[in-house]
From Swiss-Prot:
Record-linked Gene3D superfamilies: DHBP synthase (3.90.870.10)
Signal peptide interval: none
Function: Required for the formation of a threonylcarbamoyl group on adenosine at position 37 (t(6)A37) in tRNAs that read codons beginning with adenine. Catalyzes the conversion of L-threonine, HCO(3)(-)/CO(2) and ATP to give threonylcarbamoyl-AMP (TC-AMP) as the acyladenylate intermediate, with the release of diphosphate.
Residue ranges annotated for the YrdC-like domain, each copy included: 4-185
GO-annotated biological processes: regulation of translational fidelity; tRNA threonylcarbamoyladenosine modification
Catalytic activity: L-threonine + hydrogencarbonate + ATP = L-threonylcarbamoyladenylate + diphosphate + H2O
Official protein name in the record: Threonylcarbamoyl-AMP synthase
Organism: Pseudomonas putida (strain ATCC 700007 / DSM 6899 / JCM 31910 / BCRC 17059 / LMG 24140 / F1)
UniProt keyword Methyltransferase, yes or no: no
Length: 185
């Protein structure tokens, strides 16, 4: 169990521009403040991930994404809400409301409301976060804290402990407008 003090410490670090590792539902994640360009580019460099691929935003609850939903049909919001919190990621139109270092070359952004207690507590404190698997490009995602340390020894600002959520697969990714499954879970 992760103490609230450690989660609050992680929140302070994120607000100050940190890149952190933390447990998620299936694998360890890397995250940072999506509005902090330097932090996002540092995260991308750690992963050797090109900016044009775009990144996932995670949140504590659907309301943290309200700024994106102003012109959305109500059934879209209901569709997402019926699958959250949980292992469902939706590609939604971002309407140029997010920076390109988050969206990449896409006109959509990937959103998920996590059901992992550590992630939810962290997002409740700081708002939506960038979330990507904790691994350098081409390597398997970290499933243990030891693997996180082996991959990124000394390069992360904080490693927030805790247990993985027990899922075996990453979240399913669907296009909200079409319903198409982009990545099975």
């Amino acid at each position: 169990m992760v103490s609230s003090f450690r989660v609050q410490q992680a929140a302070r670090e994120i607000r100050a521009g940190a890149v952190i590792a933390y447990p998620t539902e299936a694998v360890w994640g890397l995250g940072c403040d999506p509005w902090n360009e330097d932090a996002v580019y540092r995260l991308l460099a750690l992963k050797s991930r090109p900016v044009d691929k775009g990144l996932i935003l995670i949140a504590d609850n659907i309301r943290q994404f309200d700024f994106l939903f102003e012109d959305f049909p109500e059934d879209w919001i209901d569709r997402m809400g019926s699958t959250w919190p949980g292992p469902n990621t939706w590609l939604v139109p971002h309407q140029d409301l997010l920076p390109e270092w988050v969206t990449g070359q896409h006109d959509t952004v990937a959103l998920r409301v996590s059901d992992h207690p550590v992630v939810r507590e962290l997002c409740a404190l700081v708002g939506p976060l960038i979330s990507t698997s904790c691994n350098p490009g081409g390597r398997p995602a970290a499933k243990t804290r030891l693997r996180v340390e082996q991959y990124f020894h000394g390069q992360l600002d904080l490693v927030l402990g805790g247990a993985l959520g027990g899922r075996k697969n990453p979240s399913v990714i669907r296009n909200l407008a079409t319903g198409e499954v982009v990545r099975p879970g």
